[in-house]
Every structure is written in structure tokens, then in C-alpha cells.
From Swiss-Prot:
The gene is htpX. Binds 1 zinc ion per subunit. One of its GO terms (biological process) is proteolysis. Keywords: Cell inner membrane, Cell membrane, Hydrolase, Membrane, Metal-binding, Metalloprotease, Protease, Transmembrane, Transmembrane helix, Zinc. It holds the Pfam family Peptidase_M48. The active site is at 141. Its EC number is 3.4.24.-. Zn(2+) binds at residues 140, 144, 218. Its cofactor is Zn(2+). Belongs to the peptidase M48B family. It comes from Xanthomonas oryzae pv. oryzae (strain PXO99A). It is a multi-pass membrane protein. This is Protease HtpX. InterPro entries: HtpX_protease, Pept_M48_protease_HtpX, Peptidase_M48.
């Protein structure tokens, strides 16, 4: 919790410093920006935290995940017992456990906090992974919950949203004034077109930052899964995932929280939420002092 608060404060300080430099260079009076900053923060953080609060509901609805309340099969019983054991070891509340219909080998975790989470696995995972590999995948998802990754991503996304809204309007106003030659006139239609275009451009860079952080947290979740299930099991699970070439059926709003992400080269890698599986496996093999 304290790590997330520190990261949040540090990110805000960095953003404020950068905003101050940008406004100084562009000749913008910070005193005139208070209203815009408040509006941007309300929309930037509001949307991010509403998504976080609704994440469990939306994930279950979009994937059709069925929560296991009373296990009906040995597999469901094993899933509940494994998640319960790992949650206790990680010091978090027991998450809801669900299964969703999907041919790919995948799983995801979501939820507003460490004690109100959801861990779901695909039917494809249950069909193609053995229990050791599945245990490691569950450990990976429990590590996401224990690390508070969903909350941290919401905080980061809120900061980035706010910065995009503010910077697009500041730069858009300057461009509009320079083109029109009249700083005192009201904003015309061209201003809103410029702002929209700038939000697209700045939003692209904000997405790169968010995805960079997402890739970092995947390495941490792999390490957490190795601690909970064993490093050899975690490596075996990732190797199994590398053979999974089926289409990812997870909805876009859930894909960032799955254990298996997309693949890509060049610039496309900057927009991927997951690092390449080869890099994740190499990081685990290079780690020392991890539980086997």
C-alpha cells in the first residue's frame, strides 16, 4: 500500500514539474490553469476509478465467467483450494474464482482492492495445462492482486489522462491563437479540432507509458507466481503459453490483466501490455533465491 502511495505521489510530482516546465516554455500563466486542472483531474481520475470499481462486474459480464460457489467437479474443487492456499500465503482476502469459456490458454485477475478480487481461468487452460502449470498461473494472478496492480494502473491512468487533457488544451489554445492572430477572441471550431487531434497524439504516448509499466508488472507477477508455486512450475507454465497460438478471446478491457498477451515487433511492442514470453522465461531463469 505504501509503495503505491509513494509511486502515486512521485508520479504526480513529476507530472507537475513537467507541466510547469511546459507552461513556462509556452508562456502560459499557471494561475489561469486552476480551473482546467480541476476539470481534467475530475474527468481523468473519475473515468479511471469508475472502471476500477466496475472491473469485476464488467469482466464477468464480458467474458461470461461463471463464479464457482459450490464446486461440482474435482477440477473446480482443486481451483478453489489452490487459490485459497495461495491467497493466504500472499496475505490477501479470498478472491472469487471463476471459469470462462475460451479456447486459448489464459487467465486474468481483476478487482478494486486486494480483498475484493476475481481470478478467472479459461476452459482452454484447464484442458491444456497440467496442475503444476495451472498452479503457477494462479500464483501469477494472485501476485497481481497482492501487488495491488489494478489500483496502481488506475492511479497511473488517471495521472496520464489528466496530463493529456491539460496539455492538449494548453497547446491547442496556443496554436489556435497563433493561427487566428487574436488571443482575445473566443475559441472557434478549429480550436476543438486541434485539441481533438492533440489528444489522439498525446494519448498515444500516454498509452506507451501505461503499457511500459504494465510490462514491468508482469515480470513482478511472474516472480510472485514463482514464490507461490515454484520457479520451475512458473517457467513450465510460460513455456506452455509460448506454444499457445490460439486467438485471444478476452475482451480488450480485460486483456491487460491476462497472463498471456499479444505479440509484436518494432513499434508495436511499445503498445503491448505483456513482454515477450522468452524475456519472461529468461528473467525467471536468471533470478536467484526464488522458491523452487
Amino acid at each position: 500500500m505504501f509503495n503505491r502511495i509513494f509511486l502515486f505521489l512521485l508520479t504526480n510530482v513529476a507530472v507537475l514539474m513537467l507541466a510547469g516546465v511546459v507552461m513556462s516554455v509556452l508562456g502560459v500563466n499557471p494561475a489561469q490553469m486552476s480551473g482546467l486542472l480541476v476539470m481534467a483531474a475530475i474527468f481523468g481520475f473519475g473515468g479511471s476509478f469508475i472502471s476500477l470499481l466496475l472491473s469485476k462486474f464488467m469482466a464477468k459480464r464480458s467474458t461470461g465467467a461463471q463464479v464457482i460457489t459450490e464446486p461440482r467437479t474435482p477440477t473446480e474443487r482443486w481451483l478453489l483450494e489452490t487459490v485459497r492456499r495461495q491467497a493466504q500465503a500472499a496475505g490477501i482476502g479470498m478472491p472469487e474464482v471463476a471459469v470462462y469459456d475460451g479456447p486459448e490458454i489464459n487467465a486474468f485477475a481483476t478487482g478494486a482492492n486486494r480483498n475484493n478480487a476475481l481470478v478467472a481461468v479459461s476452459t482452454g487452460l484447464l484442458q491444456h495445462m497440467d496442475q503444476d502449470e495451472a498452479e503457477a498461473v494462479l500464483g501469477h494472478e494472485i501476485a497481481h492482486v497482492a501487488n495491488g496492480d489494478m489500483v496502481t494502473m488506475a492511479l497511473l491512468q488517471g495521472v496520464l489522462n489528466t496530463f493529456v487533457i491539460v496539455l492538449a488544451r494548453v497547446v491547442g489554445g496556443i496554436i489556435d491563437s497563433a493561427v487566428s492572430g487574436n488571443r482575445d477572441s473566443g475559441r472557434g471550431f478549429a480550436y476543438y479540432i486541434i485539441v481533438f487531434a492533440l489528444e489522439m497524439v498525446f494519448g498515444m504516448f500516454a498509452t506507451m507509458i501505461a503499457m511500459w509499466f504494465s510490462r514491468r508488472r508482469e515480470f513482478r507477477a511472474d516472480a510472485g507466481g514463482a514464490q507461490l508455486a515454484g520457479r520451475s512450475k512458473m517457467i513450465a507454465a510460460l513455456e506452455r503459453l509460448s506454444l499457445n497460438h490460439g486467438q485471444n478471446t478476452l475482451p480488450s478491457q480485460v486483456q491487460a490483466f491476462g497472463i498471456s498477451g499479444g505479440v509484436g515487433d518494432g513499434l508495436r511492442r511499445l503498445f503491448l501490455s505483456h513482454p515477450p514470453l522468452t524475456e519472461r522465461i529468461a528473467a525467471l531463469r536468471a533470478a536467484n533465491g526464488t522458491a523452487m
